[in-house]
């Protein structure tokens, strides 16, 4: 059985060795993760807050409950695995979810990462956000060390490239206008995973419990840069895209000023800036697809043209 927090989703009575619980099955990552689990023939039960207005895939059982240790422990009873995909707004609840999962006898807890992982050299403005995530990661690690029946996995997937490029023109590509912003030389490499790849990474972890126990796995669909993506957009759309030149350092300065002034918008600016900050290689999680955990977990290697086609279809 499995549970996903949909805050939550629980996968029950799976034909596979594990039963799972995913958290936040309706969100940006929860939706493709839940779809991948369904394709892999896991049975899913959703756990969500009583007051949640989220919509969920048709036909899935839903448990609506308040997020207390007692209630979550009851909801998780009998589950083999729990998958936390609560996102930044709910990350503070991950500690409670881990406590409940261990108390309920859950065998595997997939912690909320789906980003850059514990070793990421992020900008100082992200330290508070990272500390919230790390609190859950450290608790899961401690629980696993103390209880041999409880294990955890973190999935470091880098930039969610098709979703991010479609949603955020500041990342360099305005899909609606077919125009681009290229930061500096456009050659800074970064690793990224498509939504389909993120979903498959969860399935792969659950299908390879021994190889993925008590560690962060690193997955990717592509290693690329802005110039490669621009060429792909132009090939796939069959037209030249006008290009505006910009600087990652200017974006860093703008984001830091907004952060210090208590203004909104700084998170996106600094997320984009640290990805394109030339020569830093902050956002390369593995030197190649082959050197990552992608082959083990069944995450496909994709070309720039394939990724761009997915962006245009979203």
Curated annotation (Swiss-Prot):
<dbReference type="Pfam" id="PF13460">
    <property type="entry name" value="NAD_binding_10"/>
</dbReference>
<dbReference type="InterPro" id="IPR051609">
    <property type="entry name" value="NmrA/Isoflavone_reductase-like"/>
</dbReference>
<keyword id="KW-0521">NADP</keyword>
<dbReference type="InterPro" id="IPR036291">
    <property type="entry name" value="NAD(P)-bd_dom_sf"/>
</dbReference>
<comment type="similarity">
    <text>Belongs to the NmrA-type oxidoreductase family. Isoflavone reductase subfamily.</text>
</comment>
<comment type="pathway">
    <text>Secondary metabolite biosynthesis.</text>
</comment>
<dbReference type="InterPro" id="IPR045312">
    <property type="entry name" value="PCBER-like"/>
</dbReference>
<keyword id="KW-0560">Oxidoreductase</keyword>
<dbReference type="GO" id="GO:0016491">
    <property type="term" value="F:oxidoreductase activity"/>
</dbReference>
<dbReference type="InterPro" id="IPR016040">
    <property type="entry name" value="NAD(P)-bd_dom"/>
</dbReference>
<protein>
    <recommendedName>
        <fullName>Oxidoreductase poxI</fullName>
        <ecNumber>1.3.1.-</ecNumber>
    </recommendedName>
</protein>
<comment type="function">
    <text>Oxidoreductase; part of the gene cluster that mediates the biosynthesis of oxaleimides, cytotoxic compounds containing an unusual disubstituted succinimide moiety. The first step of the pathway is provided by the HR-PKS poxF that serves in a new mode of collaborative biosynthesis with the PKS-NRPS poxE, by providing the olefin containing amino acid substrate via the synthesis of an ACP-bound dec-4-enoate.</text>
</comment>
